[in-house]
Amino acid sequence: CIVCGNKKLNKFLDLGKTALANNFLEPEDLNLIDEEFYPLRVAYCNNCFHVQLIDHVNPKKMFDNYLYISSASKTLTDHLYSLAKVITRKIPFKRNDLVIDIGSNDGTLLSSFKKIDKKLEVLGVEPAKNLVKFANKKNINCVNSYLDIEVAKGIVSNYGNARLVTSTNSFPHIQNLHNFMNSVNELLSDDGVFVLEAHYLVDLFEQKAFDTVYHCLLYTSDAADDRMR
């Protein structure tokens, strides 16, 4: 189990071997015999009851060049702007407070924060080089890396601690959850806030949204609350 380390996972869904999500082939790559496929099996832990994938793809294969762009979806763009508005109402930001978005994609969420509160400083952490270029065009500064404790220490050294750290739908892709949370803790100031957004398992079942089952972790509210403590 990614969360508690328990060795016993109970499989309840097997979607067979599946190509990488958001991985579009060029015309010269259409020899499907050479396309990579991976098992897509879903299980729950009989200790902490977290639902998760049994098999994990090397993150570099999925995210070093990522083709899903947040701003391409008006629905998502509007949602992220609304999220930024809710957060800025709840947190009494001061001038030059730092907001860090983990898995910042093309900077859509951070751009929303800048529109709503121009006194904020923002920083993205994004492993996909192509997405960092899009963010930079929006004047969003990014660290082109996966987050770990050493990267977090480097960010604090260069930019200071964050009043807010966000992770919207990058959080369910995290394979080393404990390292990630330690890194977030390193980034946060003493009064810092961490906001995460993840797929809700109950909605997935009710909507039969099997097409979203490629995230490492799928959360219920109770399981998320328990593990964040």
Go through the PLM ranges and name each one.
Residues 196-218:
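Short, glycine-/aromatic-enriched active-site segment of Class I SAM-dependent methyltransferases
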Residues 106-117:
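Conserved SAM-binding loop of SAM-dependent methyltransferases across substrates and taxa
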Residues 139-151:
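Conserved SAM-binding strand-loop segment of SAM-dependent methyltransferases
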Residues 166:
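A conserved beta-strand element that flanks and buttresses the S-adenosyl-L-methionine
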Residues 179-193:
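A short glycine-rich, Lys/Arg-flanked "PGG" loop and its adjoining helix->strand segment in the class I
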